[in-house]
């Protein structure tokens, strides 16, 4: 017996995507917008292990040359920004699902955040959930300050794959994308 069209709702038709992370020799500020099945640093970074020197966020680090018990970064995620140091220019491909959106807890002051989106949006719209608490958001080359006239802001579109420093005046929740959207990716809450 053939099923009806309503039976199709039980299936998940999302497909995986491949994120390409371009890394230059030295330190890079990056983020991931895909979630692989296994987000352990050793697994995700396996293709570049010979060139990887270290990856770290604000609280943890992973160095492939160290014994496993000295590495405190045990899982990567789409919410954090990461400093990645490589010995030479290399490209990393990460295959996984793109979340529909994410809710991230931010603390008063500077936060190292990821950008879990497959396409870029204007900072003014992406930061709307934080209201007037946003002081500045910046990556290595561009910045956005809501108190400045638009022509002084060099960050006009947030770029997938980059990490960002976000400064806020109080603790809050930053909602990126549509966390209630269904069928187009995983919903990520922190």
Question: Which residues does each PLM region occupy?
Answer:
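N-terminal exported-region signature
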Residues: 1-190
